[in-house]
Regions:
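Active-site microenvironment for binding and transforming phosphate-containing groups
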Residues: 1-235
Length: 235
């Protein structure tokens, strides 16, 4: 399991193919069904009082979870998609965001930050962020139609896209899009300090021996989680 360099009261991790979660997590929550959208569900005392079935219904079609509760681990599942884990020591929140290319295109990270501002009065300059393992620009080859969707959505394509020889047919060039940088730019555009952003820099497509990759037709998923705890984690 990959764990991140965080303060002792914050536990953040991404699982590998070697095994599951090996940190102490008194309560672990993840969306019942991720749909590459932008919805966030708040994990609060009211949510915890629901039955397991009601919780599953509430988190169906959700791609981000946020909480300010201690010892509650919010998670998202990925396999080439980009996980973004957030925390704020001022408002005591943690947040887990599933940013696939479609969610990135819809600016899910920006949407989640707006939810944090509305629900918890979070100030973006107090946020810390981890961009976890996901497909890199070298491996994320896309067609012209995907490139055009990002361009029409107002993204800075000069900084996010480049052409490489085709991965299957090197006689033609194909667009590649940098989803790590795209999500980093969304964070900074909302006011997150660049110094507070960590990029894991792990390409799941290249390192499919250690991390699950949907483009490699791997069936498994990486669990990416974050929680606030009164006690340092124990691996």
């Amino acid at each position: 399991m990959l764990t991140y360099n965080t303060p002792s009261h914050i536990t953040a991790f991404s699982t590998t193919r070697d095994g599951g979660v090996s940190v102490q997590t008194p309560a672990l929550y993840m969306p019942n069904h991720q749909v590459h959208g932008t919805r966030t569900v708040i994990i609060d005392e009211a949510f915890l009082s629901l039955s397991p079935l009601e919780q599953a219904i509430r988190t169906d079609g959700v791609d981000a979870l946020s909480t300010n509760l201690t010892d509650v681990c919010v998670c998202v599942k990925t396999a080439d998609c980009i996980p973004v884990l957030l925390w704020d020591d001022k408002t005591h929140i943690v947040s887990a965001v599933h940013a696939g290319w479609k969610g990135t295109l819809q600016r899910i990270v920006e949407t989640n930050i707006e939810v944090l501002k509305s629900v918890y009065s979070t100030q973006p300059e107090n946020l810390h962020a981890i961009i976890g393992p996901g497909i890199s620009v070298d491996s994320f080859e896309v067609g012209e139609e995907v490139y055009e969707q990002f361009a029409k959505a107002g993204f800075s394509m000069d900084t996010l896209a480049r052409k490489y020889p085709g991965m299957r047919d090197k006689s033609e060039t194909r667009w590649h899009i940098d989803l790590w940088e795209c999500n980093r730019q969304q964070l900074t555009s909302k006011g997150v300090n660049p110094a507070n952003i960590t990029i894991a820099g792990i390409d799941t497509y290249t390192h499919y021996d250690r991390f699950y990759s949907a483009r490699r037709h791997c069936d498994g998923r990486i669990i990416n989680g974050i929680m606030r705890t009164d006690n340092p984690f124990i691996a």
